């Protein structure tokens, strides 16, 4: 029997999964992952530390971290067939569509596709973590009729990722900030894309299928696509006054403004956004160009005063990525690439303690219709 009193649109506040992976503690402004505060970790630990923590359960020592990096480097290359498939896509395709295709095609190269054992899924997770940055970067190059960029083994994981996107080796500061962004995007409890992945995994579908669904979810502007929309607004506005006018115009038309508000954080600033704001300040100080920072701060003030809304991570990640020389269409694919580790952890957990998701509906359509003789 369906209990209509339990209907909550959008499942807001509904507990849909039990997990040991992460939890958003909004009271203490902590993102708890495996018992640690992700925000605190991001100040001293890098993305590979988070990868090891989420997949192995511990923060790695130096030997473990080096072994992890070598493992991922061995997985950088993607099959030639995937490059060929990507080259067949229309040049108008969005990189998220190319990424969705690439992840899906990867499944066909897995000779143990039906195996759901933890050790096999863990191996798949490392393969995906190694290959997805390659697919992200080179799908963009291919769609723009550019030659694929080969990974460099002498660079760190994050530095190589950024290099494959921009074609130039990042500075120490650029590498640090890009790596920190990957950390902040790595895991965030049960957003739409993670829920999608767990729902798919609950059918005992494979890891690739679950992640392919997550790509589709993350593409939406109400989820991952917001960072691209933010940068496009900043580009359109060009100046501080222009951005103020743009925001006031959107507010008067009751249009949704991307980069502000969060279903969980509600009436406070996303703590990850504050860290990306500091990163934007650091990058702006390098050449003395703080226009984007001024624009963002002006927008932040307007939205706080007029709507009581605060920036989320996407709001400040967008200008940071622009400063790093990253093309706008790659902002969301990078989001997905960094979230791959969290998604893999959730799919593995779902496989190991599974109950298929099968909710009901509150039907509001017609009843008792008859076909006349």
From Swiss-Prot:
Pfam families: Citrate_synt (PF00285). GO terms for molecular function: citrate (Si)-synthase activity. CDD domains: citrate_synt_like_1 (cd06118). It is an enzyme of class 2 (transferase). Its EC number is 2.3.3.16. Keywords: Allosteric enzyme, Transferase, Tricarboxylic acid cycle. Pathway: Carbohydrate metabolism; tricarboxylic acid cycle; isocitrate from oxaloacetate: step 1/2. GO terms for biological process: carbohydrate metabolic process; tricarboxylic acid cycle. It comes from the Bacteria. The active site is at 262, 314. Homohexamer. Citrate synthase is found in nearly all cells capable of oxidative metabolism. Belongs to the citrate synthase family. This is Citrate synthase. It comes from Heyndrickxia coagulans. The gene is ctsA.
């Amino acid at each position: 029997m369906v209990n209509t009193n339990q209907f909550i649109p959008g499942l807001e506040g509904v507990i849909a999964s039990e997990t040991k992976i992460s939890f958003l503690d909004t009271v203490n402004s902590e993102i708890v992952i495996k018992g640690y505060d992700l925000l605190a970790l991001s100040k001293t630990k890098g993305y590979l530390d988070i990868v090891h923590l989420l997949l192995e359960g511990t923060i790695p020592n130096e030997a473990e971290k080096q072994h992890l990096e070598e493992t991922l480097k061995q997985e950088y290359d993607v099959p030639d067939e995937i490059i060929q498939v990507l080259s067949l896509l229309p040049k108008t395709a969005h990189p998220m569509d190319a990424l969705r295709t690439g992840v899906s095609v990867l499944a066909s190269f897995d000779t143990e596709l039906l195996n759901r054992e933890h050790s096999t899924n863990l191996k798949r997770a490392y393969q995906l973590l190694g290959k997805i940055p390659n697919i992200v970067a080179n799908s963009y190059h291919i769609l723009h009729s550019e030659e694929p960029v080969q990974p460099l083994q002498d660079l760190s994981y994050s530095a190589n990722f950024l290099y494959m996107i921009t074609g130039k080796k990042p500075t120490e500061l650029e590498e640090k900030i890009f790596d920190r962004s990957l950390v902040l995007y790595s895991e965030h409890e049960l957003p739409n894309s993670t829920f999608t992945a767990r729902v798919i995994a609950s059918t005992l579908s494979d890891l690739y299928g679950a992640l392919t669904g997550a790509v589709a979810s993350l593409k939406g502007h109400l989820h991952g696509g917001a960072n691209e929309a933010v940068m496009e607004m900043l580009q359109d506005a060009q100046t501080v006054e222009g951005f103020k006018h743009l925001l006031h115009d959107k507010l008067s038309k009751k249009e949704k403004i991307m980069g502000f508000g969060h279903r969980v954080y509600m009436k406070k600033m996303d703590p990850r956004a504050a860290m990306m704001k500091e990163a934007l300040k650091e990058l702006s100080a390098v050449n003395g160009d703080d226009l984007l920072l001024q624009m963002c701060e002006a927008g932040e003030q307007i939205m706080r005063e007029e709507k009581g809304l605060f920036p989320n991570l996407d709001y400040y990640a967008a200008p940071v990525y622009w400063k790093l020389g990253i093309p706008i269409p790659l902002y969301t694919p990078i989001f997905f690439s960094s979230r791959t580790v969290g998604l893999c952890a959730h799919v593995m957990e779902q496989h190991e303690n599974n109950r298929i998701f099968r909710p009901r509906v509150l039907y509001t359509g017609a009843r008792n219709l008859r076909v006349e003789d």
